[in-house]
Swiss-Prot record:
GO BP field: amino acid biosynthetic process; aromatic amino acid family biosynthetic process; chorismate biosynthetic process
Cofactors required: FMNH2
Residues at which NADP(+) binds: 48, 54
HAMAP family: Chorismate_synth
Family to which this protein belongs: Belongs to the chorismate synthase family.
InterPro entries: Chorismate_synth, Chorismate_synth_AroC_sf, Chorismate_synthase_CS
Native source organism of the sequence: Magnetococcus marinus (strain ATCC BAA-1437 / JCM 17883 / MC-1)
Function: This reaction introduces a second double bond into the aromatic ring system.
Name of the protein this chain belongs to: Chorismate synthase
Length: 361
């Protein structure tokens, strides 16, 4: 199976399945000399960890990461950084009833069709369990960006089903104060009431999220096929359940006029650093970062693993009914926040290394 690696200079590869012995990853290309410990990775892993509220899967995983290589005496050596997370709370028997059935809306059918087999235990490689390793790799990228350029990458859940947060109600300080990663304290009760009904019905729901990257230097991105926005969209779209991504004004651009949409400029601190009046472009023009905040919005679909009976077919092509009894998130968007931050940080770290290597004299 190809496709388990991303990046050009800052390369990340992952391995492992939902119900396997462990998950693992390798980060290759991180410069030598970066102070790094398992605690640096564990902080973001704890934000993603399951079982922290009744609104996420009740699978209990400590997600304790072990660094195996690439770090000596507290600093990166410039060699590949290998790390591993053991799986501790698999309940494969929960999936025995669907081992020959395809869950509607799941990767079961496509994996089976392409490879001639599939790991039905929790979805195997297609499970969001794999993203724990991405979060660990993203923590390395975050620290590199923060120390090298002062870049911050942070995300939030901005909507779920009919509950949508207005931008005027945003407060980044609230994001880490609630288990929804909501930037609006007033929305938490609404999210809880709505999702409780979804959970009790054995159903699931989609969500909207945003990631902002601030402090990104001007010049990241390689036209034309390695545009920064294209690579960011690819990275975010690689997350399980993501079905739509937009940069800046995104789809609303189709309703705008040139007068409305133009990000006008005025003199700044010097000729190379003008001041932008607005940021409809989301911090990227021509595939290259402008120095403004990079703003990415995306939507995740409802998880396909629900208790509501649905019609499907089995591996023999016969009609069947599917009910998924495992432990699942009623809204995968909640834990997608640190995952998306990781994918954005990894992409920015990769482009930062490329930018550093190609800066003009």
């Amino acid at each position: 199976m190809a496709g388990s690696q991303i990046g050009t200079l800052f390369q990340v590869a992952t391995f492992g399945e939902s119900h396997g012995l462990a998950l693992g990853g390798v980060v290759d290309g991180c410069p030598a000399g970066l102070e790094l410990s398992e605690a640096d990775l564990q902080g973001d892993l704890n934000r993603r960890r399951p079982g922290q509220s009744r609104f996420t899967t009740q699978r209990q995983e400590r997600d304790e990461v072990k660094i195996l290589s690439g770090v000596f005496e507290g600093r990166t050596t410039g060699t590949p950084i290998g790390f591993i997370i053991e799986n501790e709370d698999q309940r494969s028997k929960d999936y025995s009833e669907i081992k020959d059935k395809f869950r509607p809306g799941h990767a079961d059918f496509t994996y089976w069709s392409k490879y001639g087999n599939r790991d039905y235990r929790g979805g195997g490689r297609s499970s969001a369990r794999e993203t724990a390793i991405r979060v660990a790799a993203g923590a390395i990228a975050k620290k590199l960006l923060r120390q090298a350029e002062g870049v911050t990458v942070r995300g939030a859940l901005t909507g779920m089903g009919p509950v949508v947060i207005e931008p005027s109600r945003w407060d980044w300080a609230e994001v880490e104060r609630n288990h929804f990663f909501s930037p609006d304290a007033g929305s938490v009760g609404e999210f809880e009431a709505y999702l409780e009904g979804i959970r009790k019905a054995g159903n699931s729901v989609g969500a909207f999220l945003e990631v902002h990257a601030e402090g990104v230097p001007i010049g990241l991105g390689e036209p034309v096929f390695d545009r920064l926005d294209a690579d960011l969209a690819k990275a975010v779209m690689s997350i399980n359940a993501v079905k739509g991504v937009e940069i800046g004004a995104g789809m609303a651009s189709g309703h705008a006029t040139g007068v409305d949409f133009a990000d006008e400029m005025r003199p700044g601190v010097d000729a190379r650093h003008p001041e932008f009046v607005r940021n409809h472009a989301g911090g990227i023009l021509g595939g290259i970062s402008t120095g403004q905040p990079i703003v990415i919005r995306f939507a995740v679909k409802p998880t396909s693993s629900i208790l509501v009976p649905r019609q499907s077919v089995d591996v023999h092509g016969q009609a069947c009914e599917v009910v998924t009894k495992g432990r699942h998130d009623p809204c995968v968007g909640i834990r997608a926040v640190p995952i998306a931050e990781a994918m954005v940080a990894m992409t920015l770290a990769d482009h930062w290394l490329r930018w550093r290597a190609s800066k003009p004299l």
